Swiss-Prot record:
Residue ranges of the TM segments: none
Protein name per Swiss-Prot or TrEMBL: 4-hydroxy-2-oxovalerate aldolase 2
Keyword tags: Aromatic hydrocarbons catabolism, Lyase, Manganese, Metal-binding
Family statement drawn from the similarity comment of this UniProt entry: Belongs to the 4-hydroxy-2-oxovalerate aldolase family.
Binding site for Mn(2+): 25, 207, 209
Keyword Nucleotidyltransferase: no
EC number of this enzyme: 4.1.3.39
Lineage: superkingdom: Bacteria
UniProt site positions, description: Transition state stabilizer: 24
One of the GO biological process terms: catabolic process
Binding site for substrate: 24-25, 178, 207, 298
Domain Pyruvate carboxyltransferase, chain residue ranges per copy: 16-268
Species this protein is from: Methylibium petroleiphilum (strain ATCC BAA-1232 / LMG 22953 / PM1)
Enzyme kind, highest EC tier: lyase
Length: 358
């Protein structure tokens, strides 16, 4: 046993930047319904705990307010303008998915106080991002390339996509486990492949979901292979079974000697006293969110699938498995109802659907 332990990387003194997602990914779990005042309260509590980077937007990012992705209680500009001036040490970040968010919206976010942007693409589509990344760099923003659903590309393929993002100007490239599908070996292989092709000064990040309960283990695996940025969400507030629970991950970091600069007890208090009371439902690994991780389905699909299940009479778990089989990706939310309708039709349930609609 001692020989095995001696082979484990010593992470003492390793510096890692924590990036909280509860005010962006957490919007999915709240059906985008977080009031501006509550957004400010949470952000100020995170700032006081020492969290250095906090993401604040609609769940789908800039341009996310739409029929397909849901309408938030306020615009991204309203959220950012309220939160950014209140920050004493934390920087505010935003999510931008090319094709949804625009450069004009990025400029507006910058004007409202955002200083970091996560430019997110599917793991095989980095070539949709060069203009957005270049514009973010022109603005002087901390610019991150974010490769979503990373399990759908092998390590070598993901490394090529990450290299493209670096060439476009990204200062950090993320391995993004949008489905909570990956195991530590999967994460290690992809982070190592990126580290082998990126410049030494280009950082690597990891964004996990807790659908298989692997968020913390996967994040540590990423750090072992050279990642220096880790996303998480206080109390795990996020899509599916939530993101890597940030306060739990921080406790593990403190145990391992990983340096984050964040106060553990303050973050624990934020989770218990601020985030848990605002949850509409307990964010946990349940039957449907576990199915997301097992089948490799985009975590944001969870509540959409539950709504489709109620409408068409097909169990949400079975809808999610079919979405995984079809390899549906982020941005294809409109296909969830189509899939459920097709399944209902095959099972002779459409008469019941019309009766429910009436």
């Amino acid at each position: 046993m001692s020989a095995t332990r001696s082979m484990e990387p010593d992470l003492r003194g390793r510096k890692v930047l924590l990036h909280d997602m509860c005010l962006r990914d957490g919007m999915h779990a709240k059906r985008e319904q977080i009031p501006v005042e509550q957004m400010v309260k949470v952000a100020m509590a995170l700032d006081a705990a020492g969290v250095p980077l906090i993401q604040v937007t609609h769940g789908a990012g800039l341009g996310g307010n739409s029929l397909q992705h849901g309408f938030a209680l306020a615009s991204n500009e309203a959220y950012l303008s309220a939160v950014a001036p209140k920050m004493k040490q934390a920087k505010v970040s935003v999510l931008l998915i090319p094709g949804l968010g625009t450069m004009r919206e990025l400029q507006s976010a910058y004007n409202c106080g955002a200083r970091s942007v996560t430019v997110a693409t599917h793991c095989t589509e980095a070539d949709t991002a060069p203009q957005h990344i270049a514009y973010a760099r022109k603005l002087g923003m901390d610019t991150v390339g974010f490769l979503m659903m990373a399990h759908l590309n092998d390590p070598e393929g993901l490394a090529k996509q990450g290299k493209l993002m670096e060439d476009y100007g990204a200062q950090t490239v993320y391995v993004t486990d949008s489905a909570g599908y990956m195991l530590p070996a999967d994460v290690r292989a992809r982070v190592a492949a990126l580290r082998a092709v990126l410049k030494p000064e280009t950082e690597i990040g990891f964004h996990g979901h807790h659908n298989l309960g692997m968020g913390i283990a996967n994040s540590i695996a990423a750090i072992e292979e050279g990642a220096s940025r880790i996303d998480g969400s206080v109390a795990g507030l996020g899509a599916g079974a939530g993101n890597t629970p940030l306060e739990v991950f921080l406790a593990v970091c403190d145990r391992m000697g990983i340096e984050t600069g964040v106060d553990l007890f303050k973050l624990m208090d934020v989770a218990e006293d601020v985030i848990v009371p605002m949850m509409d439902h307990l964010v946990r690994v349940d039957r449907e969110s576990l199915t997301l991780g097992f089948a490799g389905v985009y975590s944001t699909f969870l509540l959409h699938a539950k709504r489709a299940a109620a409408r068409f009479g097909v169990p949400a778990r079975e809808i999610l498995v079919e979405l995984g089989r079809r390899k549906m990706i982020g941005g294809q939310e409109d296909m969830i109802e189509d899939t459920a309708m097709s399944m209902a039709k095959e099972r002779g349930l459409l008469k019941d659907v019309s009766r429910k609609a009436a």
